[in-house]
């Protein structure tokens, strides 16, 4: 058994991870979290919340997982959320083209085109691993789960491929919540869906998974000199820049550079201070949940692998024994791609007014409505038209004026109705005005975390085999059970004292587990195997001097303290 198999065996036995739908044979790409796994995962999530909501001042929203077709059409996912697919001509089994190549040839397929993948398959004579048959040509496969809303399937929809779109759709409401004062951030934690072609990497590649995503909205002019960057500028990180990845003369070790974030920004390795800051936040979070620092690196996306919405992107990659380096976090500069896309397709104004450092003179369009004609044409909706015209940005106003001049009419789409505006309905003229601010479309820095992959890596990095025990060395922040409480023997009132202490620990917010079965050494081993950092034993001395033995997991050190100090001692240590 390799390390992965040992961990999966332990997690199944001890209630961390189970195959979903197991009694029906299971389905690849789905896992259940058992009792301890659910606590572990939630502890990872709550630590993430602490970093982003408490420390960074983001606020959390919760939106539906079912998403209408038009939303994901506008976001670009309908066209771009794809993976390369190959299908066997003989048995018709499907595989991811890039994965099947990497399993047969020592080559990196990241960012390769369909044509390049096809050439690799042909050059290396790669066959179907199931039956040995030849493959059809490489094609694209959209990874979204399709569904419909309501009876009859008339309203097409998808299960969301990311949580981010829920934030972008509600941008106007979120901006109002923050009183339209940039910068501000919103987060969402929840399920996302990816109809993987052939998920054969256990818990690493799931079809239903949990994301924790933050969207930080900022004036694009503020990304270069980001106020918070000063606090992290000296942090040194292992970086794998795009130019080093493409330099074939460098060894794998030479491609990694350790440098401060300040130097990374100054030398153009990281695009700007804003994205560098959230790289630092990611490092802090991963260290707190127990990731092995020697198994962490930040890799820059190459231009040909960049997501359709991204200007720059850095992945936090974690090393695993079986699968090597895996992407667990993406920190992307999404620019204003999403807000612009949704503005265009919804006709809603998603801009924010920002004050200028000094007043400036600008030319703007001033509209005078022919109220008599507009009122006769649109009746009760005339007021809606008037307000909608006031909200048009400069670009939309230019479109309207040009259309009226060239075509004599313009269709204005609003959330209430569409208005066909004729030239005689209004007069538009340019006037000079002194303005104290302007409308902008904010840019977005997005830290996106794959919680399931991170949770698995927490388990693998914590897993240790010693001569006489197996230990899950979880950090205090994420360990599912905080304290094991044992009576040395099941008599003389020891079980009652132990049970009372367990209850007091739980009353103080600590998950404590009572165990009176077997030798004390066996009980310690059971707690070590699930990562419990402290064990407390009630023994004969407890009956005389009210002291107990505390045993620490990692050092195995044992010492005595008064029983009435146990709760405060453990809370301080955690």
Curated annotation (Swiss-Prot):
Lineage: Archaea, Methanobacteriati, Methanobacteriota, Methanomada group, Methanococci
Main localization (coarse): cytoplasm
Catalytic activity line of the entry: tRNA(Gly) + glycine + ATP = glycyl-tRNA(Gly) + AMP + diphosphate
Binding-site positions, ATP: 194-196, 204-209, 327-328, 450-453
Keywords: Aminoacyl-tRNA synthetase, ATP-binding, Cytoplasm, Ligase, Nucleotide-binding, Protein biosynthesis
Record localization: Cytoplasm
Stated name of the protein: Glycine--tRNA ligase
Any coiled-coil regions, as ranges: none
EC number, UniProt record: 6.1.1.14
Sites where the protein binds substrate: 96, 162, 209-213, 446-450
Biological role stated in the UniProt entry: Catalyzes the attachment of glycine to tRNA(Gly).
Similarity remark: Belongs to the class-II aminoacyl-tRNA synthetase family.
Pfam families per UniProt: HGTP_anticodon (PF03129), tRNA-synt_2b (PF00587)
Biological processes, Gene Ontology terms: glycyl-tRNA aminoacylation
Gene, per the UniProt record: glyS
Domain of life: Archaea
GO molecular function, one term: glycine-tRNA ligase activity
GO cellular component: cytoplasm
Matching InterPro entries: aa-tRNA-synt_IIb, aa-tRNA-synth_II, aa-tRNA-synth_II/BPL/LPL, Anticodon-bd, Anticodon-bd_dom_sf, Gly-tRNA_synthase/POLG2, Gly_tRNA_ligase_arc, GlyRS-like_core
Species this chain originates from: Methanococcus maripaludis (strain C7 / ATCC BAA-1331)
């Amino acid at each position: 058994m390799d390390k992965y198999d040992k961990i999966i065996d332990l997690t199944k036995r001890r209630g961390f991870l189970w195959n979903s739908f197991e009694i029906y044979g299971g389905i690849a790409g789905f896992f259940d979290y058992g009792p301890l796994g659910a606590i572990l995962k939630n502890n990872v999530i709550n630590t993430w919340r602490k970093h982003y909501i408490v420390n960074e001042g983001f606020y959390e929203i919760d939106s539906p997982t079912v998403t209408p077709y038009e939303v994901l059409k506008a976001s670009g996912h309908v066209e771009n959320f794809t993976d390369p697919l190959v299908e066997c001509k003989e048995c018709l089994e499907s595989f991811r083209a890039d994965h099947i190549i990497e399993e047969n040839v020592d080559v990196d397929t990241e960012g390769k085109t369909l044509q390049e993948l096809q050439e690799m398959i042909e050059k290396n004579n790669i066959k179907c691993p199931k039956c040995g048959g030849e493959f059809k040509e490489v094609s694209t496969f959209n990874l979204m789960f399709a569904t419909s809303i309501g009876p009859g399937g008339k309203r097409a929809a998808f299960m969301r491929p990311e949580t981010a779109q829920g934030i972008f759709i509600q941008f106007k409401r979120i901006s109002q919540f923050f009183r339209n004062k940039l910068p501000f951030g919103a987060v969402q934690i929840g399920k996302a869906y990816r109809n993987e072609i052939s998920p054969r990497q256990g818990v690493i590649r799931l079809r239903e998974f949990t994301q924790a995503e933050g969207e930080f909205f900022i004036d694009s002019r503020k990304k270069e000199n980001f106020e918070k960057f000063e606090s992290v500028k000296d942090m040194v990180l292992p970086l794998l820049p795009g130019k080093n990845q493409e330099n074939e003369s460098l060894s794998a070790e030479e491609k990694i550079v350790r440098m401060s974030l300040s130097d990374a920004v100054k030398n153009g390795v990281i695009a700007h201070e804003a994205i560098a800051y959230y790289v630092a936040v990611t490092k802090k979070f991963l260290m707190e949940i127990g990731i092995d620092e020697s198994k962490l690196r930040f890799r820059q996306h190459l231009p040909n692998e960049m997501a359709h919405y991204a200007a720059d992107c850095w992945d936090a990659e974690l090393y695993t024994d079986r699968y090597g380096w895996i992407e667990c976090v993406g920190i992307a500069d999404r620019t204003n791609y999403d807000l612009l896309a949704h503005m265009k397709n919804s006709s809603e104004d998603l801009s924010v007014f920002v004050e200028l450092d000094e007043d400036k003179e600008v030319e703007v369009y001033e509209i005078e409505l022919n109220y008599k004609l507009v009122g006769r044409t649109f009746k009760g909706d005339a007021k809606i038209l008037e307000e909608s015209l006031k909200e048009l940005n400069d670009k939309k106003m230019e479109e309207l004026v040009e259309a009226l001049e060239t075509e004599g009419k313009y269709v204005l789409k609003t959330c209430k109705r569409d208005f066909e505006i004729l030239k005689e309905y209004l007069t538009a003229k340019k006037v000079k005005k002194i303005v104290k601010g302007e409308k902008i479309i904010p840019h977005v820095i997005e830290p996106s975390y794959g919680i399931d992959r991170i949770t698995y890596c927490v388990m693998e990095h914590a897993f240790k085999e010693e001569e006489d025990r197996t230990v899950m060395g979880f950090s205090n922040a994420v360990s599912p059970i905080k304290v094991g409480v044992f009576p040395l023997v099941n008599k003389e009132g020891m079980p009652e004292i132990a049970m009372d202490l367990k209850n007091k620990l739980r009353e103080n917010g600590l998950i404590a587990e009572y165990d009176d079965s077997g030798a004390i050494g066996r009980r310690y081993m059971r707690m070590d195997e699930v990562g419990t950092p402290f064990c407390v034993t009630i023994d004969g001395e407890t009956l005389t001097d009210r002291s107990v033995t505390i045993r620490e997991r990692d050092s195995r050190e044992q010492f005595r303290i008064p029983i009435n100090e146990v709760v405060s001692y453990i809370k301080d240590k955690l």
